[in-house]
Regions:
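Residue-level signature of catalytic and energy-coupling elements of molecular machines
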Residues: 38, 50, 65, 81, ...
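Conserved nucleic-acid-binding Ia/Ib motif block in the N-terminal RecA-like helicase ATPase lobe
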Residues: 90-157, 165-168, 223-226
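Interdomain coupling/hinge region of P-loop NTPase helicase/AAA+ cores
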Residues: 115, 123-126, 162-174, 178-237
Length: 240
């Protein structure tokens, strides 16, 4: 069973999202249990970043999302991430990297809300400062980890996580992770994903090292850009 939309479907979906207002525009693309959960969460309208990113992520595209904090980025990648998970497979399928433990906890909580009615999906935040043995025990059966690069690397070195079924990697606030000295960890993690997968990178700014990461680890990435003031709606190829 494919958990990704076909190219024709995503093109139609993008046009439909642009033509409609509110979350009804993406509901046909989602599992009914996800729709139920996000409606309970109070979703009525899509933010510009959600409007642009969700259809492309559902189709399996790589994207570069340039947007400030507070623009709805977590749901923009969280809804497709939950949609892609196969609940019957109790192995790691998605890795989400965040710069701090606070952001990891916050993002994990939102993903759990989105997955509320998708029984069998397990989301776990991983970060430094936790008891490592308890964290290792908690990793059993987890399909999504949301963590800081250093702690994710720690688990990779310990071989307490396996990457063979990972099909989605998200870098949230990539510029902040860069500023905190996580570039090497980010690149090592991305370089260790063995199979075909999609990569979504979100960043408020696009310094040269971030662009170097996108050039190295993404393929034909879509740029989803939300201006800080006017929240313009653009979606173009990286090389356009």
């Amino acid at each position: 069973m494919s958990y990704f939309l076909e190219n024709e479907e995503v093109n139609e979906a993008v046009e439909e999202v642009k033509a409609q207002d509110g979350i009804a525009s993406i509901e046909p693309l989602l599992d009914n249990r996800i729709v139920r959960a996000i409606r309970e969460m109070g979703f009525e309208k899509l933010s510009p970043i959600q409007e642009q990113a969700i259809p492309y992520l559902l189709q399996g595209e790589d994207i570069i999302g340039q947007a400030q904090t507070g623009t709805g980025k977590t749901a923009a990648f969280g809804i497709p991430a939950i949609q892609h998970i196969n609940p019957d497979v109790k192995k790691l399928q998605t890795i989400i990297l965040c710069p701090t433990r606070e952001l990891a906890i916050q993002a994990a909580e939102e993903l759990r809300k989105i997955a509320k009615y998708m029984h069998g999906i397990k989301v776990l935040p991983v970060y430094g400062g936790q008891d490592i043995s308890r964290q290792i025990a908690g990793l059993r059966g987890v399909q999504i980890i949301v963590g800081t690069p250093g702690r994710v690397m720690d688990h990779m070195r310990r071989r307490t996580i396996k990457l063979d079924l990972v099909n989605m990697v998200v870098l949230d606030e990539a510029d902040e992770m860069l500023n905190m000295g996580f570039r090497e960890d980010m690149e090592l993690i991305l370089g260790q994903i063995p199979g075909e997968h999609q990569t979504a990178l979100f960043s408020a700014t696009m310094p040269k090292p971030i662009l170097e990461i996108t050039d190295r680890f993404q393929k034909d990435a879509k740029i989803v850009k939300v201006a800080a003031k006017e929240l313009d709606r653009k979606s173009t190829r990286l090389n356009s």
